[in-house]
Amino acid sequence: LTNYILSEDEKYPFFFPVNGPSKASVTSMRNANYPHHSSLFFGCDKVNGGNYWQEGLERGQIISLRADILESGGERAVIENECIWRRPGADAPIKDKRTITVTAPSKDKFILDFDVTMEMLLDVTIQKTNHSLFSGRMDPDLAVTNGGTMINAEGEIGEKGTFGKRSAWMDYNGKRMGGTEGMAIIQHPSNEWFPAPWFTRDYGFFSPTPMYWPENEKTTDLKKGDVLKLRYRVIVHAGNEKEERMIAAASHVF
């Protein structure tokens, strides 16, 4: 279904492939224009002057300290992962702990729950940035530019209809190999900034991105010792309209 990639040679941990019912990944892994789009990932730019999003390990890196498989077998697996946010010549601003739960209730669907607790090790200032938090980059076959559909909980579609809009979830799907498949990202109602506005692109990128629309229009400021808990659900699925009803229902129960 998916691999969770942990390597000191990578910018941050990420998921790839993220296989749909066709057995091909619904996400893409970097390209010439956007080499920092690593499939399905979590990061942030402009954190106390560091960049924990774009290429260049010297600019900032999210490094795995520990990863444990808590549960494995049948249709369910659970991983716990601790990470530190580091860059040369600066104190680490953040450490985080992730709990990743993957379930496969049917051959046409799997669910990935990504729960992250971020602890501020310093006073943290995040400058306004469109590079923030949980994000997905779809395979070009499924992008709006190639006939795919991006739709939010309110039924608004495409980059024009969804960019900057607050919505509980977003689904991205398209036709491939004779069928329709896609991936939805759902924000948990307990999340700070819920529902965060979305940064969306018809070429395949989508992310609930609160740091691009900060309340003071300049920065997101967190104090040393602050704890930020965020939860996201990813549903990789066949179909579209029927699945969107299922996604809407799932947004209330995880």
Where are these regions (language model features)?
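A short, structured loop/turn motif at beta-sheet edges
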Residues: 68-77, 104-108, 175-180, 190-194, ...
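Beta-strand elements of well-folded, non-transmembrane domains
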Residues: 22, 83-87, 100-104, 118-122, ...
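Hydrophobic residues positioned within well-ordered beta-strands of beta-sheet architectures
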Residues: 79-81, 96-98, 112-114, 134, ...
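Beta-strand-rich recognition/accessory modules
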Residues: 185-254
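Beta-strand-rich N-terminal accessory domains
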Residues: 1-35, 241, 247
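Extended, loop-rich substrate-binding clefts of extracytoplasmic carbohydrate-active enzymes
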Residues: 38-108
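Acidic (Asp/Glu-rich), glycine- and aromatic
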Residues: 4-19, 105-150
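Active-site/ligand-binding surface loops and adjacent short beta/alpha elements
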Residues: 123-195
